[in-house]
Amino acid sequence: MSYFTIQNEDLPQGFTFRPHDKIYDSLWEMMDDGYFPSTIPLKTTINGVDMPSVGWLEVDEGLYDILIDGLDVLRPTDEEMIVSATGWPLEKNRALILNFFRNLRMDIIGTYTLQRSFITIMSIVLFGDQNPRLRRKKRSRVSLGKMLFDLALRMRSKIRRMKLTEVQVTGQNLVKDLCLLHILDLQKRLVTRGTIAEKRFFTAIEQAPCNYEPKRYGMKKKHMNFMFESDRKNLTVHPTLVNLEEHWITFESARERLLDTTFTKDWPVVGSL
């Protein structure tokens, strides 16, 4: 099977399965309402979660291409440079999750092997990376469904610690989004070390009629009106700290445009997802 099944007893008190008629922008929004999916797909998206993770747009194109091509094509020194920057959830530097992502993305190995690999990674998130024997012992005491629920909680906590938004990582594909968090954490470390330049991109949100009545700041004619409160704050921060979350939520066409796979030649990262 290319999915994991959740049982009723796997969910904590106060949670139940998502009704078929309820659709959410993110898995986190679904959980806030006390619901959880009955299945977690390995390769496809979770039913009932509508918005993809736009955080993939922040992954450096060169780094992404390297991960898809495989680390073994690099010179040993370059491979070591990337592997040494791996972090959460790993406590020991290695290419475990990077290789898993490539195998998942390129469909290189069978579904059963992919599932076992993901369970190992999930066990590391929940039970630590230092003692494999102790980790396996703890894993044997917990159902797979409960592990998946706890994994979602850990990932949401990591999103907040990384100061990401729940639009950047929506949980629509929980398996891929775990890889996304790992890759963004890796990329941040590479930027800090000066290995790659910080990626900055600017988006032009297309003009559209808006029913929102913007707040007025002051009475002078030169004062600007803003569609969103975040627009005013964005004028005072560094470009890398600009918050476009309200734009992503409001303008569905902007999300579709940014994630459109027809832009393969112009934007290989998006086209390759």
Swiss-Prot record:
Compartmental location: Host cytoplasm
Keywords: Host cytoplasm, Host-virus interaction, Inhibition of host innate immune response by virus, Inhibition of host MAVS by virus, Inhibition of host RLR pathway by virus, Viral immunoevasion
A GO biological process held by the record: symbiont-mediated suppression of host cytoplasmic pattern recognition receptor signaling pathway via inhibition of MAVS activity
Main location: host cell
Tree of life domain: Viruses
Keyword Protein transport belongs to the record: no
GO cellular component annotations of the record: host cell cytoplasm
Transmembrane segments: none
Assembly information from the UniProt record: Interacts with host MAVS; this interaction weakly inhibits the host IFN response.
Summary of the function given for this chain in its UniProt record: Acts as a weak IFN antagonist.
Family: Belongs to the phlebovirus NS-S protein family.
Protein name listed in UniProt: Non-structural protein NS-S
Naturally occurring in which organism (per UniProt): Uukuniemi virus (strain S23)
Taxonomic placement: Viruses, Riboviria, Orthornavirae, Negarnaviricota, Polyploviricotina
Gene name of the record: NSS
